[in-house]
Every structure is written in structure tokens, then in C-alpha cells.
Amino acid sequence: MINSKMRTPEGDIYEVFARFREPNLHHIGSVVATDDDLAKMYAAKLYDEWGWREMTVVKRAAIITVIAPV
């Protein structure tokens, strides 16, 4: 069974973070990919509207929740 919050039938969900001029990364969206290399390529192509200084992707399944809504 696929956990729809972490995966889709097309692949894993990756969260995309980037920064332009500010010192901290900001969440800018998400992509779906079958592996890390595709996730990087999809993020770079999909979110190319700025000249980002830094961009990173992380599998949603790798995010550890500290405080969650009840």
C-alpha cells in the first residue's frame, strides 16, 4: 500500500528548498521522482524562475516531525 503523503504511484515526493539572497533556505514546493537524481533535475527545471544561490531537495519520508497538529 502506498502512503499518499510520502509517495505517489509515479514515485517519491520530494520537498524543494531554496534561497536567493537571504541567508536561510525556504520551502518553495515539491516534485515527484523515482530517484534523487531525477528529483534534482525536476526541481531545477520546475523552479528555475530565480537565479537561486542554493537549492536542495529532501524526500518527504526523511523529514522528522518534531511538533505535529493534533
Language-model regions, residue ranges each:
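A short, exposed loop/beta-hairpin motif centered on an aromatic-Gly-Thr core
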Residues: L25-T34
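Glycine-rich, charged/polar anion/phosphate-binding loops
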Residues: M1-N3, M41-Y42
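A short, charged, amphipathic alpha-helix used as a generic interaction element across diverse proteins
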Residues: T34-W52
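Short acidic, gly/pro-rich beta-turn/loop elements at beta-sheet edges
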Residues: H26, M41, T65-I67
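Short aromatic-glycine-(Arg/Gly/Cys) micro-motifs in beta-strand/loop hairpins
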Residues: S4-H26
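Short, mixed-charge low-complexity intrinsically disordered segments
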Residues: I2, Y47-V70
